Amino acid sequence: MTDSGWKIILAPEYASEVRKFEEHGTVLSSKDQFHGDIPGFEPFNAGSLIELQLVKYMAKKSCSKSAGHVFSSLSLESGRVVQEMCSDDPNWRPIQAESTAVRMIAHLTAAVFAGRQLCRNSEWIDITIQYSLTAMVAAEQLWRWPRLARRMAARFLPSCRLLSAQVQRANELVSTTSQARKDETTATQQAGMEQSTSYHDGLEWMEEYARGRPYRPGVTQLAVTLGAVDTTKDLLMQVLYDIAGKSDLMDALRREIVAIVSEHGWTKTTIVNLQLMDSMIKESQRLKPVGISKLSGIRRTAASDIHLSDGGIVPKNVPFEISNMHMWDDADLYPDPLSFQADRFLRLRQVPGHEATAQLASLSADHLGWGLGKNACPGRFFVAMEVKVLLCHLILKYDWRLEDGCISEVRRYGTFLSADPEGTLLVRRRREEVDLDGPLV
């Protein structure tokens, strides 16, 4: 029994087997748990609509031919938001880890998927941050009602009314921005001039994929933030907790950044070659999976009976999860599994057969941080780039340590794990060895 109802928990060895059952997708589970058929919860119910295809298309677009433009947007906006959140104060000053991390991640995610105009719109950033929080409260309150009464209850519950208002306002903001772009294009064409502006962002990709088919722009954008902001914020927080105050590790990360930027310049190639940083993030994710529970590396709902190889059956319409505890309690898989070893996966890359699976964005039954199979996190390559670009700015430009008395305990909420939401970090400006804010090369 979990906080959201009965579920079957399967052992880790079933991970590869369940991968074969791709028709048993996560959409069923998400819609059921978050009342996707009730007004206000529309971003949780995009599974059978064009919005889901739009979200997946944008995720692929962000790490394909548009990756260079994505890197440019991430770097430009990282410089802005890091300076805004961390300041240029050379003296130690406290910052609240969660509020700082979520603001930075929401800003960068919007820069790529909603465009520069919306990423610098504080109202839009507030909505993308608050929507998931409101949804969690509203969903929990609706769980207390009988299923048949939930739609009616949502009409008067303040949290549900607020949720609907946030979706409506999101649609208005995105539609207004998209319409302004269309008007600009029309005016350019009427003037007989060639259209020269290409935005290389999610708003453009949505129109490109939809090809005139109707869709809900605000719902689509909120669906993106549901999968991108909270989980990535949580990952960034845990990484900062794990490296803060570790001077030897910070120095090693800085040496790697400086060496590769000096050789390749500040480009997307730099990000690919940051192998120690890549390993460090993956190790942090191993010990504290992001956005998933201690027992839920993979979450599915059976669309039909699933017959397992040992004779076991997962009945139709029953939610099930696969334990990921082997990631931190299996010493045969990961020697000294409870210790944080930043170079663990860097060393694992040298082992034949692990050259690819040891990379941050790779999928493996041994590391379920992103899930597994066709329904694994489609935005993992973008998240890897986003977090690395941001960390380059944060590590090169600032010293970090935990506030005295802060032990950054992982919090458990039902079957979920969360980086300490009350932790405080101390930060001070330092002079970076290479410039990350100049013209990109």
From Swiss-Prot:
Task: State the residue spans of region: Disordered.
Answer: 175-195
Q: What are the TM regions of this chain, as residue ranges?
A: none
Bias type Polar residues, positions: 186-195
Q: Which cofactor does it need?
A: heme
Question: Which GO molecular function annotation, any one, does this entry have?
Answer: oxidoreductase activity, acting on paired donors, with incorporation or reduction of molecular oxygen
Pfam families with a match to the protein in the record: p450 (PF00067)
> EC no.?
1.-.-.-
Q: Which InterPro entries match?
A: Cyt_P450, Cyt_P450_sf
List UniProt keywords, sorted A-Z.
Alkaloid metabolism, Heme, Iron, Metal-binding, Monooxygenase, Oxidoreductase
**Where on this chain does heme bind?**
C377
Q: Which CDD domains match?
A: CYP503A1-like
Its UniProt entry gives the catalysed reaction(s) as: campesine D + reduced [NADPH--hemoprotein reductase] + O2 = campesine G + oxidized [NADPH--hemoprotein reductase] + 2 H2O + H(+)
One of the protein's GO biological processes: secondary metabolic process
How has the protein been applied in practice? Campesine G features good insecticidal activity against the global honeybee pest Galleria mellonella, which supports its future application in the development of biopesticides.
Q: Tell me which SUPFAM superfamilies the record gives.
A: Cytochrome P450
Q: In which pathway does it act?
A: Alkaloid biosynthesis
Known function = Cytochrome P450 monooxygenase; part of the gene cluster that mediates the biosynthesis of campesine G, a dimeric indole piperazine alkaloid that shows good insecticidal activity Galleria mellonella. Within the pathway, cpsC catalyzes regioselective dehydrogenation reaction towards C2-N1 of the (2H)-indole ring of campesine D to yield the final product, campesine G. The non-canonical non-ribosomal peptide synthetase cpsA catalyzes the first steps of the pathway by producing L-tryptophanal and L-valinal from their respective amino-acids.
Q: Which family does it belong to?
A: Belongs to the cytochrome P450 family.
Q: What is this protein called?
A: Cytochrome P450 monooxygenase cpsC
What organism is this sequence from? Aspergillus campestris (strain IBT 28561)
